Amino acid sequence: MNVLIPSQLRDYTGGRAHVEARGGTLAELLADLERRHPGIRFRMIDEQDAIRRHIKIFVNQQPTRDLGTALAANDEVVIVGALSGG
């Protein structure tokens, strides 16, 4: 399925905004992203296996924080990272 990667994580994807990944759940998709792009998962998931507070994930335009969210092959996943500034 198509995954949109936020600009602050594109160093892990060779600069690509759109990447392919597979998984029956959001957790499996993130594990596949990690396999394809080592180091990216830790930037999104904390030590307690929860989505980091500054990361938002949308599946077919619906926000989710549940790693058990079921996915289908034609779903679109958008990962958004909050930007900070001062």
What are these regions (language model features)?
Residues M1-G85:
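Ubiquitin-like/PB1-type beta-grasp interaction modules and other compact soluble beta-rich domains
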